[in-house]
Amino acid sequence: MRNFTIETADGRLLAWANSNWTNLVISKGIPARLTPADTDNYVLSEKMEMDYAPRKISLPDGMISQEPFQVQKHHLDTNHHVNNCQYICMAEDFLPEKFKVYQMRAEYKMQAKLGDMICPKAKVESGKVVVSLDDEKGKPYAIVELAEK
């Protein structure tokens, strides 16, 4: 688990986050054992006080299939798969007009690569939009939840 904040120069809190990470052996797709070289640059501190959402995002009933699209070069990161931020941008395409995002949650499931098809499903509920960005078999690459205050 990793907590972090973004603050102004005078210490006013602008944003805060909690994220869960797994260090992987990329060639095998399995968790890697951490070494001192992986951890020495990080300082452990107390868990921040905040509302901690569940790790998994629940898909609501009645998700509506949207127009599929193909992964393009501009979606890719240096590892040649879709950059995590791009999944958020894709999900934002399904926000209603004047929706003001207060909270974003993302669950990254598998890597999409150049040429893969993204088959989105979305559901707008009161104060919240949930988007599942799936492969052609309906398996999610990422699930994104955007909520208003």
What label would you give each PLM region?
Residues 20-22, 68-75, 107, 147:
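Generic structural detector for well-ordered beta-strands
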Residues 25-99:
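Hot-dog-fold acyl-thioester-processing enzymes
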Residues 95-125:
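A conserved acidic, glycine/proline-rich C-terminal tail/linker
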Residues 1-55, 112-114, 123-149:
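HotDog/MaoC-like acyl-thioester-processing domains
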